[in-house]
């Protein structure tokens, strides 16, 4: 029996399907990769902008991470929108234990220009998550940050 490679995305949602975990899962599927997702934030957005962001509870975030990592071992992990320091602090121990490639996509600003991450979270990301990444995939507009 042939098994598909498995990848995990940890990010926010995008109901329009153009970004976030929805886009990640479509990308995985297009490459014949079995995709799993842990949702960090629920984002109401469209092509006109971001209307509302609600972060999942710490309890829910931890439960999703435990559910995935206790069952199916990903062969690659990608993080996207990690909007708060608290979210990053919960995820970081899982990233430290990885024995697979980790892709860090530092999503800080929506395509519409709306800010998705605060200054303290940006600093935490640079100091604590950047060193763990196998590869970093910032948008061109974020390279100077």
Regions of interest found by a model, annotated:
Residues 25, 92, 140-141:
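Short glycine-/small-residue-rich flexible loop motifs, especially phosphate/cofactor-binding loops
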Residues 1-76:
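Small-residue (G/A/S/T)-rich helix-start motifs and N-terminal tracts that mark the onset
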Residues 49-135:
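Ribokinase/PfkB-type carbohydrate-kinase core domain
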Residues 143-145:
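Conserved small/polar residues in nucleotide/adenosyl-binding loops
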Residues 12, 105, 139:
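Active-site glycine-centered loops adjacent to acidic/histidine catalytic or metal-binding residues
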Residues 40-43, 107-108, 141:
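Short, ordered loop/turn segments at secondary-structure junctions
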């Amino acid at each position: 029996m042939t098994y598909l490679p498995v990848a995990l995305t940890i990010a926010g949602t995008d109901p329009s399907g153009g970004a976030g975990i929805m886009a990640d899962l479509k990308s995985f599927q297009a490459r014949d990769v079995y995709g799993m997702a842990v949702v960090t934030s629920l984002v109401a957005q469209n092509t006109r902008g971001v209307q509302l962001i609600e972060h999942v509870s710490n309890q829910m975030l931890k439960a999703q991470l435990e559910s995935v990592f206790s069952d199916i071992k990903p062969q690659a992990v990608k993080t996207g929108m990690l909007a708060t320091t608290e979210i990053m602090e919960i995820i970081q121990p899982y990233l430290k234990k990885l024995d697979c490639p980790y892709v860090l996509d530092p999503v800080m600003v929506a395509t519409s220009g709306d800010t998705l991450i605060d200054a303290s979270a940006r600093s935490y990301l640079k100091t604590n998550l950047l060193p763990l990444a196998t590869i970093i995939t910032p948008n061109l507009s974020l390279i100077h940050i």
